[in-house]
Curated annotation (Swiss-Prot):
Name of this protein: UPF0329 protein ECU03_0030/ECU05_0040/ECU06_0010/ECU06_1710/ECU11_0010
Superkingdom, natural source: Eukaryota
Family: Belongs to the UPF0329 family.
Source organism phylogeny: Eukaryota, Fungi, Fungi incertae sedis, Microsporidia, Unikaryonidae
Length: 118
């Protein structure tokens, strides 16, 4: 089995973050993962080295390394793929269309010179 650059732990952490954070369109998650692994930020991460260096001195546990990987990768995910998710665009358009329909209905009833009697 061939693991991506950086090892299995960062890959799994990034994969989890990408699939949780990418809304709706699941085809965007693999693109985000691929884009992040190619970024210079990711190439600097060395979870195993960090664990080996700090194990005796500050009592770092494997869970700390995992949490650190998730923290770094979530920060990286903020930097990579800054484009607006497609789902947000659809929701925004839907909201704009609904607002335009409300304005149109309002104009039909009130803006055409007809007044509502009380």
């Amino acid at each position: 089995m061939c693991f991506p650059v950086g090892g299995l732990l960062p890959y799994l952490a990034l994969r989890s973050v990408a699939y949780i954070c990418v809304f709706g369109d699941s085809s965007r998650a693999p693109d985000l993962i691929r884009e992040a692994f190619e970024s210079p930020h990711f190439k600097r991460f060395d979870g195993a080295g960090t664990y080996k260096e700090a194990k005796g001195r500050c009592g770092m546990r494997f869970a700390d390394v995992v949490n650190g990987a998730f923290g770094q990768i979530s920060d990286m995910a903020d930097k990579v793929g800054k484009g607006e998710p497609e789902v947000w665009c659809i929701w925004k358009k839907r909201g704009e269309v609904e607002m335009l329909l409300k304005v149109k209905e309002y104009r039909k009833g009130y803006g055409s010179g007809k007044r509502r009697r009380r």
